[in-house]
Amino acid sequence: MTGRMPGLIVLFDVDGTLTAPRKAITPKMLEFMQDLRKVVTVGVVGGSDLVKISEQLGKSVISDYDYVFAENGLVAYKNGELIGKQNFKSFLGEEKLKELINFTLHYIADLDIPIKRGTFIEFRSGMLNVSPIGRNCSQEERDEFEKYDKVHNIRSKMVSVLREKFKHLNLTFSIGGQISFDVFPQGWDKTYCLRYLEDFPEIHFFGDKTYKGGNDYEIYESERTVGHTVTSPDDTAEQCKLHFLAKQAGDA
Protein backbone atom coordinates (compact mmCIF):
# COMPACT_ATOMS: atom_id res chain seq x y z
CA MET A 1 0.00 0.00 0.00
CA THR A 2 1.27 3.48 -0.86
CA GLY A 3 1.21 6.46 1.44
CA ARG A 4 2.01 4.57 4.62
CA MET A 5 4.37 5.98 7.24
CA PRO A 6 7.49 3.79 7.00
CA GLY A 7 8.86 1.95 10.03
CA LEU A 8 5.76 2.61 12.11
CA ILE A 9 3.08 0.21 13.34
CA VAL A 10 0.03 0.94 15.49
CA LEU A 11 -1.21 -1.86 17.77
CA PHE A 12 -4.66 -1.98 19.34
CA ASP A 13 -6.22 -3.89 22.20
CA VAL A 14 -9.74 -5.17 21.39
CA ASP A 15 -12.15 -4.91 24.37
CA GLY A 16 -12.72 -1.31 25.42
CA THR A 17 -10.39 -0.04 22.69
CA LEU A 18 -11.82 -1.08 19.31
CA THR A 19 -15.13 -2.37 20.69
CA ALA A 20 -17.32 -2.04 23.76
CA PRO A 21 -16.57 -4.99 26.10
CA ARG A 22 -17.42 -8.29 24.34
CA LYS A 23 -19.45 -6.42 21.70
CA ALA A 24 -18.90 -6.41 17.95
CA ILE A 25 -17.03 -3.56 16.29
CA THR A 26 -19.37 -0.92 14.86
CA PRO A 27 -19.46 -0.34 11.07
CA LYS A 28 -18.23 3.22 11.71
CA MET A 29 -15.21 2.01 13.69
CA LEU A 30 -14.45 -0.71 11.15
CA GLU A 31 -14.44 1.87 8.36
CA PHE A 32 -12.18 4.12 10.43
CA MET A 33 -9.68 1.30 10.97
CA GLN A 34 -9.56 0.59 7.24
CA ASP A 35 -8.91 4.28 6.57
CA LEU A 36 -6.16 4.27 9.20
CA ARG A 37 -4.57 1.25 7.56
CA LYS A 38 -4.03 3.32 4.42
CA VAL A 39 -1.54 5.54 6.28
CA VAL A 40 0.01 3.20 8.91
CA THR A 41 0.61 -0.51 9.42
CA VAL A 42 -2.06 -1.77 11.82
CA GLY A 43 -2.05 -4.69 14.25
CA VAL A 44 -4.49 -6.07 16.81
CA VAL A 45 -3.35 -7.75 20.04
CA GLY A 46 -5.99 -9.36 22.25
CA GLY A 47 -5.97 -11.68 25.22
CA SER A 48 -8.79 -13.77 23.78
CA ASP A 49 -8.41 -16.61 21.32
CA LEU A 50 -8.96 -16.05 17.60
CA VAL A 51 -12.56 -17.32 17.72
CA LYS A 52 -13.56 -14.65 20.23
CA ILE A 53 -11.58 -11.92 18.47
CA SER A 54 -13.34 -12.89 15.22
CA GLU A 55 -16.73 -12.63 16.95
CA GLN A 56 -15.90 -9.02 17.81
CA LEU A 57 -13.88 -7.84 14.80
CA GLY A 58 -15.37 -10.03 12.06
CA LYS A 59 -14.63 -13.37 10.43
CA SER A 60 -12.13 -11.81 8.02
CA VAL A 61 -10.10 -10.25 10.86
CA ILE A 62 -6.78 -11.88 9.94
CA SER A 63 -6.93 -10.29 6.50
CA ASP A 64 -8.50 -6.99 7.66
CA TYR A 65 -5.33 -6.08 9.59
CA ASP A 66 -1.63 -6.48 8.85
CA TYR A 67 -0.98 -8.36 12.09
CA VAL A 68 -3.40 -10.17 14.40
CA PHE A 69 -2.08 -11.42 17.72
CA ALA A 70 -4.50 -13.69 19.58
CA GLU A 71 -3.82 -14.76 23.16
CA ASN A 72 -1.32 -11.88 23.61
CA GLY A 73 0.59 -12.93 20.49
CA LEU A 74 1.01 -16.58 21.46
CA VAL A 75 -0.98 -17.25 18.30
CA ALA A 76 0.30 -14.81 15.66
CA TYR A 77 -0.86 -13.94 12.13
CA LYS A 78 0.74 -11.71 9.52
CA ASN A 79 -1.09 -10.85 6.28
CA GLY A 80 -3.58 -13.64 6.97
CA GLU A 81 -0.93 -16.34 7.53
CA LEU A 82 -0.08 -18.08 10.82
CA ILE A 83 3.51 -17.15 11.75
CA GLY A 84 3.80 -18.46 15.32
CA LYS A 85 2.11 -20.50 18.05
CA GLN A 86 3.06 -21.21 21.67
CA ASN A 87 1.61 -23.87 24.00
CA PHE A 88 0.89 -23.40 27.73
CA LYS A 89 0.41 -27.10 28.46
CA SER A 90 3.80 -28.08 27.03
CA PHE A 91 5.48 -25.28 28.96
CA LEU A 92 3.93 -26.08 32.37
CA GLY A 93 3.48 -29.87 32.19
CA GLU A 94 0.33 -31.85 32.93
CA GLU A 95 0.87 -32.32 36.69
CA LYS A 96 1.49 -28.64 37.46
CA LEU A 97 -1.36 -27.62 35.18
CA LYS A 98 -3.72 -30.02 36.95
CA GLU A 99 -2.63 -28.71 40.36
CA LEU A 100 -3.36 -25.15 39.24
CA ILE A 101 -6.77 -26.02 37.78
CA ASN A 102 -7.84 -28.10 40.80
CA PHE A 103 -6.94 -25.37 43.29
CA THR A 104 -8.69 -22.71 41.18
CA LEU A 105 -11.91 -24.75 40.93
CA HIS A 106 -11.91 -25.40 44.70
CA TYR A 107 -11.47 -21.68 45.32
CA ILE A 108 -14.39 -20.80 43.03
CA ALA A 109 -16.56 -23.50 44.64
CA ASP A 110 -16.07 -21.84 48.05
CA LEU A 111 -16.59 -18.32 46.68
CA ASP A 112 -19.73 -16.57 47.93
CA ILE A 113 -20.92 -14.32 45.10
CA PRO A 114 -24.51 -13.49 44.02
CA ILE A 115 -24.61 -15.81 40.99
CA LYS A 116 -22.51 -18.47 39.28
CA ARG A 117 -23.02 -19.95 35.84
CA GLY A 118 -20.72 -22.27 33.85
CA THR A 119 -17.27 -22.45 32.21
CA PHE A 120 -15.21 -21.16 35.12
CA ILE A 121 -11.93 -22.10 33.44
CA GLU A 122 -11.31 -21.88 29.70
CA PHE A 123 -8.19 -23.63 28.45
CA ARG A 124 -6.56 -21.78 25.56
CA SER A 125 -3.42 -22.47 23.56
CA GLY A 126 -1.23 -20.08 25.51
CA MET A 127 -3.06 -19.47 28.78
CA LEU A 128 -5.91 -20.24 31.17
CA ASN A 129 -8.82 -17.82 31.39
CA VAL A 130 -10.49 -17.90 34.82
CA SER A 131 -13.95 -16.45 35.48
CA PRO A 132 -15.41 -16.53 39.03
CA ILE A 133 -18.96 -16.06 37.69
CA GLY A 134 -18.45 -18.35 34.67
CA ARG A 135 -18.20 -17.36 31.01
CA ASN A 136 -21.69 -18.71 30.24
CA CYS A 137 -23.32 -15.74 31.97
CA SER A 138 -25.55 -13.38 29.99
CA GLN A 139 -24.46 -9.86 29.03
CA GLU A 140 -26.70 -8.44 31.76
CA GLU A 141 -25.13 -10.77 34.36
CA ARG A 142 -21.69 -9.85 33.02
CA ASP A 143 -22.42 -6.14 33.53
CA GLU A 144 -23.73 -6.78 37.06
CA PHE A 145 -20.67 -8.82 38.02
CA GLU A 146 -18.37 -6.07 36.77
CA LYS A 147 -20.11 -3.58 39.10
CA TYR A 148 -20.02 -6.08 42.00
CA ASP A 149 -16.34 -6.80 41.40
CA LYS A 150 -15.44 -3.10 41.49
CA VAL A 151 -16.89 -2.93 45.02
CA HIS A 152 -15.84 -6.34 46.40
CA ASN A 153 -12.58 -6.93 44.45
CA ILE A 154 -13.41 -10.59 43.80
CA ARG A 155 -10.89 -10.99 40.98
CA SER A 156 -8.04 -9.07 42.57
CA LYS A 157 -8.39 -11.02 45.86
CA MET A 158 -8.44 -14.30 43.96
CA VAL A 159 -5.38 -13.29 41.95
CA SER A 160 -3.51 -12.46 45.18
CA VAL A 161 -4.23 -15.93 46.59
CA LEU A 162 -3.23 -17.72 43.38
CA ARG A 163 -0.10 -15.63 42.95
CA GLU A 164 1.10 -16.59 46.44
CA LYS A 165 0.10 -20.25 46.15
CA PHE A 166 1.80 -20.76 42.77
CA LYS A 167 4.72 -18.32 43.00
CA HIS A 168 7.11 -21.23 42.32
CA LEU A 169 5.65 -21.59 38.80
CA ASN A 170 6.57 -18.01 37.73
CA LEU A 171 3.13 -17.24 36.37
CA THR A 172 1.50 -13.91 35.54
CA PHE A 173 -2.11 -13.24 36.57
CA SER A 174 -3.64 -10.49 34.47
CA ILE A 175 -7.12 -9.02 34.98
CA GLY A 176 -8.93 -8.11 31.76
CA GLY A 177 -12.43 -7.62 30.43
CA GLN A 178 -15.45 -7.60 32.73
CA ILE A 179 -15.54 -11.04 34.35
CA SER A 180 -12.22 -12.87 34.14
CA PHE A 181 -8.45 -12.91 34.40
CA ASP A 182 -5.73 -14.68 32.42
CA VAL A 183 -3.00 -16.97 33.75
CA PHE A 184 0.19 -17.50 31.73
CA PRO A 185 3.98 -17.83 32.17
CA GLN A 186 5.90 -14.64 32.94
CA GLY A 187 6.79 -12.86 29.71
CA TRP A 188 3.76 -14.26 27.89
CA ASP A 189 1.86 -10.99 28.33
CA LYS A 190 1.11 -8.70 25.37
CA THR A 191 4.80 -7.81 25.04
CA TYR A 192 5.20 -11.33 23.60
CA CYS A 193 3.89 -10.06 20.25
CA LEU A 194 6.74 -7.54 19.96
CA ARG A 195 9.18 -10.29 18.92
CA TYR A 196 7.38 -10.35 15.56
CA LEU A 197 7.82 -6.60 15.04
CA GLU A 198 11.60 -6.17 14.91
CA ASP A 199 11.29 -4.35 11.57
CA PHE A 200 9.37 -1.47 13.20
CA PRO A 201 11.49 1.08 15.10
CA GLU A 202 8.33 2.96 16.14
CA ILE A 203 5.49 0.99 17.76
CA HIS A 204 2.40 2.72 19.15
CA PHE A 205 0.00 0.82 21.41
CA PHE A 206 -3.57 1.82 22.32
CA GLY A 207 -5.35 0.11 25.21
CA ASP A 208 -7.78 0.75 28.05
CA LYS A 209 -6.43 -1.46 30.86
CA THR A 210 -2.99 0.13 31.07
CA TYR A 211 -2.89 0.28 34.88
CA LYS A 212 -0.70 -2.12 36.93
CA GLY A 213 -2.41 -5.52 36.95
CA GLY A 214 -4.40 -4.74 33.80
CA ASN A 215 -3.73 -6.85 30.72
CA ASP A 216 -2.43 -3.86 28.72
CA TYR A 217 0.04 -2.73 31.39
CA GLU A 218 3.23 -4.51 30.29
CA ILE A 219 3.04 -3.55 26.62
CA TYR A 220 1.97 0.00 27.53
CA GLU A 221 5.03 0.36 29.79
CA SER A 222 7.46 -1.41 27.43
CA GLU A 223 10.51 0.56 26.29
CA ARG A 224 9.73 -0.54 22.75
CA THR A 225 6.31 1.10 22.59
CA VAL A 226 4.72 4.52 22.78
CA GLY A 227 1.72 3.84 25.02
CA HIS A 228 -1.68 5.53 24.74
CA THR A 229 -4.50 5.03 27.27
CA VAL A 230 -8.04 5.17 25.86
CA THR A 231 -11.48 5.09 27.45
CA SER A 232 -13.65 3.89 24.54
CA PRO A 233 -13.60 3.14 20.79
CA ASP A 234 -14.60 6.77 20.11
CA ASP A 235 -11.64 7.97 22.17
CA THR A 236 -9.37 5.58 20.25
CA ALA A 237 -10.52 7.04 16.94
CA GLU A 238 -10.08 10.63 18.14
CA GLN A 239 -6.55 9.99 19.43
CA CYS A 240 -5.58 8.23 16.19
CA LYS A 241 -6.89 11.12 14.10
CA LEU A 242 -4.72 13.47 16.13
CA HIS A 243 -1.56 11.36 16.03
CA PHE A 244 -1.67 9.86 12.53
CA LEU A 245 -4.36 11.18 10.20
CA ALA A 246 -3.80 14.88 11.00
CA LYS A 247 -0.04 14.33 10.75
CA GLN A 248 -0.45 12.65 7.36
CA ALA A 249 -2.64 15.50 6.12
CA GLY A 250 -0.06 18.01 7.34
CA ASP A 251 2.74 16.20 5.52
CA ALA A 252 0.78 15.99 2.28
Swiss-Prot record:
Other information: Overexpression of Dendrobium officinale PMM in Arabidopsis increases total leaf ascorbate and polysaccharide content, and increases seed germination rate under osmotic and salt stresses.
Gene Ontology biological process: GDP-mannose biosynthetic process; mannose metabolic process; protein N-linked glycosylation
Subcellular location: Cytoplasm
Keywords associated with the record: Cytoplasm, Isomerase, Magnesium, Metal-binding
Enzyme Commission numbers on file: 5.4.2.8
Binding-site list for Mg(2+) 1: D13, D15, D208
Known role: Catalyzes the interconversion of mannose-6-phosphate to mannose-1-phosphate, the precursor for the synthesis of GDP-mannose. GDP-mannose is an essential sugar nucleotide for the synthesis of D-mannose-containing cell wall polysaccharides (galactomannans and glucomannans), glycolipids, glycoproteins and the antioxidant L-ascorbate. Involved in the biosynthesis of ascorbate and polysaccharides in response to abiotic stress during seed germination.
Protein source organism: Dendrobium officinale
Subunit (UniProt): Homodimer.
Active site: D13 (nucleophile), D15 (proton donor/acceptor)
Family: Belongs to the eukaryotic PMM family.
Stored NCBIfam families: HAD-SF-IIB
Pfam family name, one: PMM
Signal sequence, start to end: none
Name of this chain's protein: Phosphomannomutase
Tissue expression: Expressed in roots, leaves, stems and flowers.
Highest taxon of the lineage: Eukaryota
Taxonomy of the source species: Eukaryota, Viridiplantae, Streptophyta, Embryophyta, Tracheophyta
A molecular-function term among this protein's GO annotations: phosphomannomutase activity
